[in-house]
């Protein structure tokens, strides 16, 4: 199954696009944030495909974690209770130090960490594929421990 996320197309403006995705067996990933009201969350999740992306904090991607993992999990659990069958992945500001505390989530997005590793590898003339593989393995081990 292919997945698509369009960050500047919020609910309900994205309904037509989401329907077109569904017809083509493409998941359209809805964005949820800590400031999304409960009423709006219920409507978004009701209309959503099987997976949603929870923006853990109000910041820029790859920013330093400014919210405690406990607060992130509190918001995650509030969202998850609306429909436990929908997958909720957490992203924004995830670091290898915090993901262990968030391992109860359906998934954790670490895109900025991967981008930083690619840049670091290229700047030091190392193999980015190898180094990203090592990073992913390290993060996976943190979650498993």
Model-identified regions with their sequence ranges:
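Short, small-residue-biased leader/transition segments that mark boundaries at the very start
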Residues: 1-2
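Active-site-adjacent beta->alpha loops and helix N-cap segments on the catalytic face
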Residues: 6-23, 37-42, 61-78, 96-100, ...
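Non-cysteine beta-strand/loop elements that form the S-adenosyl-L-methionine
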Residues: 7, 50-57, 109-112
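Active-site beta-loop-alpha junctions enriched in small/polar residues
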Residues: 9, 31-35, 57, 91-97, ...
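Short beta-strand/loop segments at the ligand-binding rim of alpha/beta enzyme cores
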Residues: 21-31, 79-93, 145
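Histidine/lysine/aspartate-rich catalytic loop segments that bind and position anionic ligands
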Residues: 25-63
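Catalytic cores of alpha/beta
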Residues: 36-47, 82-83, 90-108
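C-terminal helical cap(s) of enzyme catalytic domains, especially alpha/beta-barrels
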Residues: 114-145
């Amino acid at each position: 199954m292919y997945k698509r996320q369009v960050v500047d197309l919020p609910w309900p403006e994205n309904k037509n696009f989401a329907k077109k995705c569904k017809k083509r067996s493409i998941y359209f990933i809805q964005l949820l944030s800590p400031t999304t009201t409960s009423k709006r969350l219920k409507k978004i999740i009701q209309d959503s495909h099987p997976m949603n992306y929870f923006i853990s904090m109000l910041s820029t991607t790859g920013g330093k974690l400014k919210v405690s993992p406990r607060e992130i999990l509190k918001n995650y659990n509030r969202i998850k209770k609306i429909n436990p069958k929908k997958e909720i992945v957490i992203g924004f500001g995830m670091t290898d130090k915090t993901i262990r505390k968030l391992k109860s989530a359906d998934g954790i997005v670490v895109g900025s960490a991967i981008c930083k590793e690619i840049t670091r590898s290229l700047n030091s003339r190392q193999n980015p594929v190898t180094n990203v593989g090592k990073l992913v393995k390290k993060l996976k081990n943190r979650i498993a421990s």
